[in-house]
Amino acid sequence: MVDPKDWLEFGQKFHGHKCPAMPMGLRVGAAAMNKIGVERAKDGQITAFVDLGDNHCATCYADGLQVIMGTTFGKGNIKKTHKGKWAVTLVDRANGKAVRVTPKAEAMLQNKQSAFFKDYREKGIPASKVPSEVVDPIINNVMNAPEEKLINISEVFDYKLEPHKDSFAGFVCEECGEMTVEEYGRLKSGKQVCIDCAAK
C-alpha cells in the first residue's frame, strides 16, 4: 500500500511551497494506485489523465500526483485534459485497467473557505508567504482525514491506450542549429528546419 505521508516532505520540496492542493494530490494519487494495485512509475508503466485546466486555483494538486505516482512531464505519462476539474484517471498500461479518483466537492469547498484562501490567496498573496500557522492545519486535515470523507474512488474499469514507441530519430536544424526530433521537422526552401524556423 502506498502511504501519502511518506511523500509529504519530498512533495513540499519539489513543489516549492506549502498549500493544501499538493497534499490533496498525494492523497488522490495514493488512493488511485492502491485501488488498481500499481507501484510508482519508474518508466511509463502507468499513465495519468488529470482534468485540470490552466490559470485556476489549486493546480498545485498535479505536483502531488506527479510526486507520488511517478507520472511526470519528462516521462510523458501525465496528460492534462483541460476540463477545469481535479479528477485523475490512472491507467495501468500492463493490463488496461483504470480508476478515476477525485477529491470530494465538500472537502474542496471546506479548503476554499479557509483563511489560507480567503485571507491570503484570493488577495493575491503567494502561497509561499502564507504563515505556517495558517497553512499547516489545513495540510494536517488533508493528510489525516479519513479517505471516505476526502475522496471519491470509482470502480476499476477497462481503458484502452494505444501503444506508443519513443522516437530516437533527430536532426540539426539547418537555420538555428538546434537539435530537433525528426517528426517535428519541416522543409523550408529545401532545408530541414525546426518548427520555429519554418515559421520565420
Descriptions of predicted regions:
Residues 1-18, 25-200:
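Non-transmembrane, aqueous-exposed alpha-helical and coiled segments at domain scale
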